[in-house]
Swiss-Prot record:
Protein known as: Fatty acid desaturase 3
SUPFAM superfamilies: Cytochrome b5-like heme/steroid binding domain (SSF55856)
Annotated GO CC locations: endoplasmic reticulum membrane
Record topology, Cytoplasmic segments: 1-130, 174-259, 304
Keywords: Electron transport, Endoplasmic reticulum, Fatty acid biosynthesis, Fatty acid metabolism, Lipid biosynthesis, Lipid metabolism, Membrane, Oxidoreductase, Transmembrane, Transmembrane helix, Transport
Family matches, as SMART domains: Cyt-b5 (SM01117)
PANTHER family, A to Z: FATTY ACID DESATURASE 2, FATTY ACID DESATURASE 3
Species for this entry: Bos taurus
Entries under Gene3D superfamilies matching the protein: Cytochrome b5-like heme/steroid binding domain
GO terms under biological process: lipid metabolic process; sphingolipid metabolic process; unsaturated fatty acid biosynthetic process
Motif (Histidine box-1): 180-184
Broad class of where this protein is predominantly found: endoplasmic reticulum
Recorded name of the encoding gene: FADS3
UniProt free text on domains: The protein sequence includes a number of characteristic features of microsomal fatty acid desaturases including the three histidine boxes (these domains may contain the active site and/or be involved in metal ion binding), and the N-terminal cytochrome b5 domain containing the heme-binding motif, HPGG, similar to that of other fatty acid desaturases.
Length: 443
């Protein structure tokens, strides 16, 4: 059909004109079993295929009834390959008089961002340096060996054990960073190699599931700081962030003393996230989703760790060392990953364009050789969120271009000192707690 209406066109009808659709029609298809999305003005019915989406049905479903063009480009390297999967899902295209994006969006910003992405591709900033990532893996393995040699040569006393725990925690933190690079397919050109290497780093070196991490982390990138779409900020009723503070206050919900959440954060946030929450969530995901290969990889980590340290400590001592390492790395994980997000805007879906949504949810931390290494280059969070598949050693080169784009459109490009970024987490929690208390008492 050539007019505007519900499509009756079949993908196999080569040469036939595509049905034309309006945004009003597209918006009606954003239900759990009925989802359409728009990529490059073409409309796709992903209702059935979403369950087969490699990134998970939730990830692609978060873009239901939206223009997902920039997300499509951001998450995929080989677009010609991915388009083969889209073709059978094609049901129409936007009518000529329809805008490319639904709702009040800055068309000029969208065009400028896409021009920036093309310029970045022309500069070959999506090409990785194998030696850089080889050194990262090498220094992780070296720390694992060094920690064991320290106990082997000096014995399991308090001083060697403390030093070994610190070294292992640093190794675990750097493993988080490396598997994060691999999960974003930013090292190898072939996505399969990235995923295989990620399973090794995440499974054998850390004891976690690569599929579990990608499931939750890709959602964070698709919709950062959006409740019920970004798992990292969907933390109520334990902590109240952003708009949830007023909502809980008005509804007189008081499961915890939220006006003191900036204090109990130190007790249950940094110490326990990796040790308790991640361990339980990770195991549940592997069992429920039947990720048996990930389970074997994770089991190989625990087998290696226990076999390495039980001869020196016995079973209780080896488990205590494991807990110490997990608690130390958990502190690193919480502070480093949240310093860029918790102090920023957190709330419900605003349906912004890609660049605006990422910039509203992120900020940077002043770079230095140490901070770049220590944070896994997550101090360049703005650049990472705009270009998630970009190898991190290129963030410094693209940063001035992103900053210029923000200046042109009056967008915030915030860069903080490292310690200020850490303190702002506590300030933000305290502010949200006070907002909750005010709403609880007076609204």
């Amino acid at each position: 059909m050539g007019g505007v209406g519900e499509p009756d066109w079949e993908p196999g009808q080569r040469g036939a004109p595509l049905p034309t659709l309006r945004w009003e029609q597209v918006r009606r298809h954003n239900l759990p079993g009925d989802k359409w999305l728009v990529i490059e003005r073409r409309v796709y019915d992903i209702s059935r295929w979403a369950q087969r989406h490699p990134g998970g049905s939730r990830l692609i479903g978060h873009h239901g009834a939206e223009d997902a063009t920039d997300a499509f480009h951001a998450f995929h390297q080989d677009l010609s390959f991915v388009r083969k999967f889209l073709q059978p899902l094609l049901i129409g295209e936007l009518a000529p008089e329809e805008p490319s994006q639904d709702g009040p969006q800055n068309t000029q910003l969208i065009e400028d961002f896409r021009a920036l992405r093309q310029a970045v591709e022309d500069m070959k900033l999506f090409e990785a340096k194998p030696a850089f990532f080889g050194l990262l893996l090498g220094h992780i393995l070296a720390m694992e060996v060094l920690a064991w040699l320290m106990i082997y040569m000096l014995g399991p006393g308090w001083v060697p054990s403390t030093l070994a725990a610190l070294i292992l925690a640093i190794s675990q933190a750097q493993s988080w960073c490396l598997q994060h690079d691999l999960g974003h397919t930013s090292i190898f050109r072939n996505s399969r190699w990235n995923h295989l290497a990620q399973q090794f780093v995440m499974g054998q070196l850390k004891g976690f599931s690569a599929h579990w991490w990608n499931f939750r982390h890709f959602q964070h990138h698709a919709k950062p700081n959006i409740f019920h779409k970004d798992p990292d900020v969907t933390v109520a009723p334990v902590f109240l962030l952003g708009e949830s503070s007023v909502e809980y206050g008005k509804k007189k919900r008081r499961y915890l003393p939220y006006n003191h959440q900036h204090l109990y954060f130190f007790l249950i946030g940094p110490p326990l996230l990796t040790l308790v929450n991640f361990e339980v969530e990770n195991l549940a995901y592997m069992l429920v989703c039947m990720q048996w290969m990930d389970l074997l990889w994770a089991a190989s980590f625990y087998a290696r760790f226990l076999l390495s340290y039980i001869p020196f400590y016995g079973i209780p001592g080896a488990l205590l060392l494991f807990v110490a390492v997990r608690v130390l790395e958990s502190h690193w994980f919480v502070w480093i990953t949240q310093m860029n997000h918790i102090p920023r805007e957190i709330g419900h879906e605003k349906h912004r364009d890609w660049a605006s949504s990422q910039l509203a949810a992120t900020c940077n931390v002043e770079p230095s050789l140490f901070i770049d290494w220590f944070s896994g280059h997550l101090n360049f969070q703005i650049e990472h969120h705009l270009f998630p598949t970009m190898p991190r050693h290129n963030y410094r080169r693209v940063a001035p271009l992103v900053k210029a784009l923000c200046a042109k459109h009056g967008l915030s490009y915030e860069v903080k000192p490292f310690l200020t970024a850490l303190v702002d987490i506590i300030r933000s929690l305290k502010k949200s707690g006070n907002v909750w208390l005010e709403a609880y008492l007076h609204q």
